[in-house]
UniProtKB/Swiss-Prot annotation:
SUPFAM superfamilies noted in UniProt: Cyclotides
Pfam families hit by this protein: Cyclotide (PF03784)
Gene Ontology biological process: defense response
Highest taxon above the source species: Eukaryota
Keywords, in A-Z order: Disulfide bond, Knottin, Plant defense
Covalent cross-link site, Cyclopeptide (Gly-Asn): G1-N30
Protein name: Vitri peptide A
Gene source species: Viola arvensis
Organismal lineage: Eukaryota, Viridiplantae, Streptophyta, Embryophyta, Tracheophyta
Free-text note regarding domains: The presence of a 'disulfide through disulfide knot' structurally defines this protein as a knottin.
Disulfide bridge map: C4-C20, C8-C22, C13-C27
Post-translational modification: This is a cyclic peptide.
Similarity remark: Belongs to the cyclotide family. Bracelet subfamily.
Role of this protein: Probably participates in a plant defense mechanism. Has strong cytotoxic activity against human lymphoma U-937 GTB and human myeloma RPMI-8226/s cell lines.
Amino acid sequence: GIPCGESCVWIPCITSAIGCSCKSKVCYRN
């Protein structure tokens, strides 16, 4: 539930490397 400061509209979350995932076009962590 914490925004990772990255969007995932066009590309996947690069921040997935630290546990972020795409939700509603924005990368979140927990």
